[in-house]
Amino acid sequence: MSVNSVGVQLSNASLRYNDREHATLSGLSLSLNAGKWTVLLGRSGSGKTTVLRYLAGLLDDKVEWQGTLATSDELPLTDRIAYMAQQDLLLPWLSVIDNVCLSHRFQNPASDKAQQTNQALELLAAVGLADYANAMPDQLSGGMRQRVALARTLMQDKPVVLMDEPFSALDAVTRHKLQSLACELLRDKTVVLITHDPQEAVRLADNLYVLQGTPASAHSLSVPLTSTPRVLDGECAELQQAILDQLERDYE
């Protein structure tokens, strides 16, 4: 575990939108272990993305939130979070390397640009796109664009990484490869991944929660002790079925 890894504990949290009578989340408790992947599943509307937005400090005054958030080093999460969304969010008028550098330059305007460029080139090489530094986003496939987004996330070098279905729009083989790549490159980061794919959850989770019920609360499921990304075996198949069984309770 790297020295800047940070664990996060969310305790007894509840959330209600001001224009709704009933809460979306209630009694929610999550342990986001330092340097590990925590995976959240749940039906649409169960509050998964809202949890990420809360962690990122992006909730507005339309939401009433109660609960306790504590970090393992007792420091605030402000400025220690990187966010990777389902859409790659690449700016079409910037080259690949400029997209990778963009967030870092906003956050570190005084840093040396030559050093930034060299770091970005190293990250593009790590995601297999060293030859595309000067390409434009519209010249890339969907999988390549998400690899650029992954490089941009790494460029921010934050100890906590929030991922909101970043691989869901990709074909099965590309998704599998990017899962493995992200697992390798984000090792020692504290990662929170939202997914609707039980198989993806089984491959990547060190901790796994299903948001279930109305209002939703978090139900923890035990994961295999094998290292991630996992090779799918019989134990993984059993966990995948357990996830589906838990999710189906919201449709009964």
What positions do the PLM features span?
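Helix-to-loop junction immediately C-terminal to a conserved catalytic motif
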Residues: A56
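Short coil-to-helix segment of the ABC ATPase nucleotide-binding domain corresponding to the Q-loop/switch region
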Residues: L94-S103
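Conserved ABC ATPase "signature" region
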Residues: K113-Y132
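Conserved ABC ATPase signature
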Residues: M136-L140, M144
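Hydrophobic anchor residue at the start of the ABC signature
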Residues: L150
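A short, proline-enriched helix->beta-strand linker immediately N-terminal to the Walker B motif
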Residues: M155-P159
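Helical segment within the ABC ATPase nucleotide-binding domain
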Residues: R175-R187
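Conserved beta-strand-loop-alpha-helix hinge in the C-terminal portion
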Residues: G213-L244
